[in-house]
Amino acid sequence: MRDTLSDLEAGKQLSDENPIIRAQKLMQAQLPKRFYEQVEVAEVEGGFAVHLDGRPVKTPARSLLMLPTASAAEIVAEEFRAQEKVIDPGKMPATRLVNTAIDGIAQDPQAVLEDILRFAGTDLLCYRADAPQELVSRQTARWDPLIDWAETLGARFTLAEGVMHVEQSREAITAFGIHLSAFTDPIALASLHTMTTLTGSAIIALAIAKGEVSAEDGWTLAHIDEDWTTEQWGEDAEAAARRKARAVEMMIAARVIKAL
């Protein structure tokens, strides 16, 4: 039996410097047929693997797909059980996240940590509307508590109105980075990076990871501007569909990091 997901490999060359892009390129190819009946989580040396008919799942780069906890591995197992005629990575966000972590982030975790910190330097929560007053008030009421929370971590962020760039202090980014660096597991970093890029806010991502806010509340906080615009002008169907798809990715990332 071939290695699971080997048909998803896009090529042997991993020339991309970005470890996330490098890992994701391995997962872009013709979809393999579902060839298994039973999906189980099995304890192995160093963690927990997902077995298909008794054989361990491997990543596109042929590494063992292993997670540190049984509950995290079960999230991936659920996705394999849900596959029907083919194995479709597009419907397997947790599996993609773990593959990215193992094949990419584990090789260069510092690059991913630095990318999250770059988001912190231009965090969504730091850029406020100057009008209309209703939106200004909504942002203040909903975003300020997380800005205050970040300050309790030693990260004092500077706010700005409009689109003018504001430089965050080295002290704020350093303090924020100390708390991010506590998440050393590549899968945790993958989850944090996913939540950060989907929301545009490293503060929201860290707050979810630390249990300060729920994933659902964090997602709502990230869309205050969008929701206000929808209230004024109505919903765009295509934008709503894209948001719904991103929300699935967001909730899975939050669920995985909580299960580690």
Regions found by a protein language model. Give the residues of each.
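Hydrophobic/aromatic-lined pockets within catalytic cores
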Residues: 81, 146, 151, 207-213
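An N-terminal structural lobe/cap that precedes and organizes the functional/catalytic core
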Residues: 3-107
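An internal, amphipathic alpha-helical element
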Residues: 166-239, 252
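Alpha-helix initiation and N-capping motif
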Residues: 70-73, 95, 109, 113, ...
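Internal, conserved structured core segments that host functional sites
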Residues: 110-175
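Extended, aromatic/histidine-rich regions of cofactor-dependent oxidoreductases associated
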Residues: 2-35, 39, 214-260
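Conserved aromatic-histidine-acidic binding/catalytic patches
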Residues: 64, 131-134, 138, 187, ...
